[in-house]
């Protein structure tokens, strides 16, 4: 195996590093770029990997991937998504930037601006991660490919923007690897980026891909510079007030599509009834869908949001056996629990139903008959596991064993929780009956299959159309294409169970439909339980836009199986236009697990004393949009105390208090200066970005726009000091009035923008400001909705500080990691100070060091922005507390005065 690398070719950095890491036995030859290696290519192409079987690889990412896989590593879906992003987004932008800098002589700071969105995407993806790498706790090919693309332009971490601390830290870590250092030095030869000039001069000038990149769509802070026209337009929109603005629409039920209007049908994945949803379930479907539904209503779009519990299947039967209840009793019990949890989280379903209804049976059987009549169903004999002791076939969750793909020891008979792959129960190694733990035998049973190969062509045609016109998340597209690429196979739609929708066909009447055939039909049947005019939503694809929200493991059933059923039924069903899938939310350093009780569950959240809106905010702030993210108690405290208390809450409270204290609760006259108009334009730009992002269902990123506006507001108040101006002459008092009036109108706008995310806080702000009803519609412009003379109500703080002791208590209470283990091992009533050292192992020290670094960066950022002393001091105290805790964890004195003095310098 030989690797040929061209001198001065930037793509050589990553392949040389990958070879050093994972392919030590490869022979490396360095050639001039003009030398031709691949005989069947008309033009020279380097780098090239000449494989021992006579084949060639000549894409740098493919070469890196080959080295990585050949060394025994595996690639997950997330790895492939990152490599796709790097090739489609990052590489083109970096190539153009490197060419502009090296060949055209443009300043590095100028070309850096052209890649800032991509770099910010990387920085945000790395921020808050406990791991120093992009996707795992260990280095992967993704880190090397991305680092190798960035390195030729950046060379040194000091060239990255100061505010991108997470990216700088990652870049430095990878750059310090011996293999990466050797790869870079052997190619750059101490010449820096200029070494690439001879190669780049022979290349055509790169063209930046047209249109906005994914990163720019995701990025809420990357605002374009403001022109005089922007500022003038913002001032004119402000002056119009609410004139011509649409009024909030009444929503009489049942809500039905209206011809000529934007009709939005929203579904969130039906939660399994048999268990209490955890925070990952909540953010993955119902909360994300709720934010979008509330946003649509704010825009006066005709919107219906439906959901319900998925109540059929083996999970319900096994749960009923565990609790000594009937399946129906289990469904009734847990449906009530789900309903209560979602009500507490303020999820605004228009209708929350269930699948154990007559409508579910009728509609499922109708679709089945239509598929049968059109010959889209097959009959086949299936080998299944049967427990002789229990006298039943062991479908899905009735059996557990070792995963045939990843060797996970507790894989279910339908899917592995660890690797996510779908499994046939007979494929399990060492299977056991879930009920009696006996080893089952293999027996045959006749079943019905959906003939997916026969439907594949029409499915592909529909998918291409939906991909091109709809907003599908990248993971949804990737997973769907993977299924199509691998070729569709007939899929079993029946099970040997009692609890489910009965199969209406002779020879199969003792069976029920497999849950993934009839569960998505639950969206339709739940709508039918809401209104007898359900077909206006579900058989009207021309005038309805359907949004499906779910976690990524549900994607194939919503993008392949369910649409195939509806296409095959040939009954003009509404198919999904926009499929919005999240990655996974982890818990601290582990994973949530319903069956193993790991993590915070919905019914526990309300017992913490933390309001529902704070939970909503934090879950949406860390929403796993591009990759997996993690719930962290420390980070929850940090975000509450910094973003909510010190940023958003501080601004809204000050704006209202100034009106109350200085102007007797009456909005003052406003005479705008140029700096005020510029602020209006900044706010308008953030509002436009917020709308753009939410229309694209970029929920997490749109939240940043809200926080940006409140930051602008805090800075505006701090610079203009209305509390001083009000004590001055008449002109200064007028200035105080203008600043206060603009600020309180910004607070009013924030209350509307906050509504999808924090509906209770939104209502509290609106009540405090006594906002008129007609102002509670989200417009596309920032206008003055609280005119001079408007009387506001009593203003009070919106948020409370979360204390470290409170958070540590909750961390211990909800387990996970060392604390959970300790509580089991040491139930004795030792004093807290005696127990503390047990939790201060190397893992805790590492965690504290990361928290300390993050808090230190935060304090420096606040000081750099010249924030108020009242804002900085609490953060400094938090920093000192972390230093003290770290010293204790390391067994040092917590209060070394000489070191403290040095730190203050």
Curated annotation (Swiss-Prot):
- Which compartments does it reside in? Cytoplasm, Cytosol; Nucleus, Nucleolus
Q: Which Pfam families match?
A: Anticodon_3, GST_C_3, GST_N_5, tRNA-synt_1g, WHEP-TRS
GO annotation, biological process = methionyl-tRNA aminoacylation
The record, for Gene3D superfamilies, names: 1.20.1050.10, Glutaredoxin, HUPs, Isoleucyl-tRNA Synthetase, Domain 1, Methionyl-tRNA synthetase, Zn-domain, S15/NS1, RNA-binding
Which residue numbers delimit the WHEP-TRS domain?
Answer: 844-900
User: Biased-composition ranges for Basic and acidic residues?
Assistant: 841-874
Ranges for domain GST C-terminal: 72-199
Q: What class of enzyme is it?
A: ligase
The entry lists its GO molecular-function terms as: ATP binding; methionine-tRNA ligase activity; tRNA binding
Query: Chief subcellular site?
Result: cytoplasm
Q: Catalytic activity, per the record?
A: tRNA(Met) + L-methionine + ATP = L-methionyl-tRNA(Met) + AMP + diphosphate
Per its UniProt record, what PANTHER family does this chain match?
METHIONINE--TRNA LIGASE, METHIONINE--TRNA LIGASE, CYTOPLASMIC
Give the record's subunit note.
Monomer. Part of a multisubunit complex that groups tRNA ligases for Arg (RARS1), Asp (DARS1), Gln (QARS1), Ile (IARS1), Leu (LARS1), Lys (KARS1), Met (MARS1) the bifunctional ligase for Glu and Pro (EPRS1) and the auxiliary subunits AIMP1/p43, AIMP2/p38 and EEF1E1/p18.
Q: Which NCBIfam families match?
A: metG, PRK00133.1
What is the protein name stated in its UniProt record?
Methionine--tRNA ligase, cytoplasmic
Species the sequence originates in: Xenopus laevis (African clawed frog)
Top-level taxonomy: Eukaryota, Metazoa, Chordata, Craniata, Vertebrata
């Amino acid at each position: 195996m030989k690797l040929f690398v061209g001198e001065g070719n930037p793509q050589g950095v990553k392949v040389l590093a990958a070879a050093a890491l994972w392919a030590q036995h490869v022979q490396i030859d360095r050639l001039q770029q003009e030398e031709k290696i691949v005989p069947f290519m008309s033009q020279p192409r380097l780098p090239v990997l000449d494989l021992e079987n006579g084949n060639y690889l000549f894409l740098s990412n493919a070469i890196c991937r080959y080295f990585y896989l050949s060394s025994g590593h595996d690639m997950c879906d997330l790895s492939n998504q990152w490599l796709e992003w790097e090739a489609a987004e990052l590489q083109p932008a970096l190539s153009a930037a490197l060419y502009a800098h090296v060949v055209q002589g443009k300043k590095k700071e100028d070309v850096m601006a052209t890649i800032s969105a991509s770099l910010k995407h990387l920085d945000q993806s790395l921020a808050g991660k406990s791991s120093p790498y992009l996707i795992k706790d260990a280095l992967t090919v993704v880190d090397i490919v991305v680092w190798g693309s960035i390195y030729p332009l950046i060379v040194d971490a000091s060239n990255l923007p100061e505010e991108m601390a997470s990216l700088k830290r990652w870049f430095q870590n990878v750059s310090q690897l011996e293999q990466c250092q050797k790869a870079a030095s052997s190619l750059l030869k101490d010449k820096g980026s200029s070494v690439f000039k001879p190669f780049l001069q022979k290349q055509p000038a790169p063209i930046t891909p047209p249109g906005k990149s994914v990163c720019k769509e995701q990025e809420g802070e990357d605002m374009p510079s403001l022109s005089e026209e922007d500022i003038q337009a913002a001032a004119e929109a402000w002056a119009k007030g609410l004139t011509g603005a649409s009024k909030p629409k009444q929503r009489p039920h049942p809500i039905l599509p209206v011809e000529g209007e934007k009709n939005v049908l929203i579904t969130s994945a039906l939660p399994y009834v048999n268990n209490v949803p955890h925070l990952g379930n909540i953010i993955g479907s119902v909360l994300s869908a709720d934010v979008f539904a509330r946003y649509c209503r704010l825009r006066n779009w005709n919107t219906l949001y439906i959901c319900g519990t998925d109540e059929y299947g083996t999970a319900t039967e096994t749960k009923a056996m565990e609790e000594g209840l009937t399946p129906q009793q289990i469904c009734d019990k847990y449906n009530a629990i789900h309903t209560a949890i979602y009500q507490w989280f303020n999820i605004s379903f228009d209708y929350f139903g269930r699948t154990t209804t007559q409508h579910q049976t009728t509609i499922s059987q109708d679709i089945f008959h239509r598929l049968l009549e059109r010959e889209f169903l097959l009959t086949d004999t299936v080998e299944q596991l049967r427990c002789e002791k229990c006298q039943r076939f062991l479908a899905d969750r009735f059996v557990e064993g070792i995963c045939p793909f990843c060797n996970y020891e507790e894989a279910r008979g339908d899917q592995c929780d660890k690797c996510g792959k779908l499994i046939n129960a007979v494929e399990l190694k060492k299977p056991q009956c879930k009920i009696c733990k006996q080893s089952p035998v293999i027996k045959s049973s006749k079943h019905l299959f959906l003939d997916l190969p026969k439907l594949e062509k029409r499915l592909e045609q529909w998918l291409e159309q939906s991909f091109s016109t709809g907003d599908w998340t990248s993971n949804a597209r990737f997973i769907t294409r993977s299924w199509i690429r691998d070729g569709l196979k007939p899929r079993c739609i029946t099970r040997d169970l009692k609890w489910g929708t009965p199969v209406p066909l002779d020879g199969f009447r003792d069976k029920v439909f497999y849950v993934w055939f009839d569960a998505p039909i639950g969206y339709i049947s739940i709508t039918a339980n809401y209104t007898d005019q359900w077909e206006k939503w579900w058989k009207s694809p021309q005038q309805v836009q359907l949004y499906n929200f779910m976690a990524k493991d549900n994607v194939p059933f919503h993008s392949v199986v369910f649409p195939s059923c509806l296409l095959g039924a040939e009954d003009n069903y509404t198919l999904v236009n926009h499929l919005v899938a999240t990655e996974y939310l982890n818990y601290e350093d582990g994973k949530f697990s319903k069956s193993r009780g790991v993590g915070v569950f919905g019914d526990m959240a309300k017992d913490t004393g933390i309001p529902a809106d704070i939970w909503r905010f934090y879950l949406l702030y860390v929403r796993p949009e591009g990759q997996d993210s993690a719930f962290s108690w420390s980070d929850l405290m940090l975000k509450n105390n910094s973003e909510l208390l010190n940023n958003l809450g501080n601004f809204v409270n000050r704006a209202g208090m100034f009106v109350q204290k200085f102007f007797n609760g009456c909005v003052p006259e406003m005479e705008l200066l140029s700096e005020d108009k510029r602020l209006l334009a900044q706010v308008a730009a953030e509002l436009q970005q917020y709308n753009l992002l939410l229309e694209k269902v970029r929920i997490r990123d749109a939240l940043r726009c809200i926080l940006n506006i409140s930051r602008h507001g805090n800075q505006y108040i701090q610079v203009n000091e209305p509390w001083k101006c009000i004590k001055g002459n008449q002109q200064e008092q007028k200035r105080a009035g203008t600043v206060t009036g603009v600020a309180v109108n910004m607070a009013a706008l924030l209350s509307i923008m906050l509504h999808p995310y924090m509906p209770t806080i939104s209502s509290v702000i609106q009540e405090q400001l006594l906002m008129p009803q007609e102002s509670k519609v989200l417009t596309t412009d920032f206008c003055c909705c609280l005119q001079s003379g408007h009387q506001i109500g009593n203003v009070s703080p919106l948020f409370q500080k979360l204390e470290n002791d409170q958070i540590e208590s909750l961390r211990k209470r909800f387990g996970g990691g060392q604390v959970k283990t300790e509580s089991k091992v040491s139930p004795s009533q030792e004093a807290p100070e005696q127990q503390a050292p047990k939790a201060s192992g190397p893992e805790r020290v590492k965690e504290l060091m990361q928290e300390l670094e993050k808090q230190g960066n935060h304090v420096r950022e606040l000081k750099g922005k010249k924030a108020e002393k009242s804002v900085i001091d609490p953060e400094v105290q938090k920093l000192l507390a972390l230093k003290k805790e770290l010293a204790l964890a390391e067994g040092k004195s917590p209060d070394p005065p000489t070191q403290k003095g040095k730190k203050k310098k």
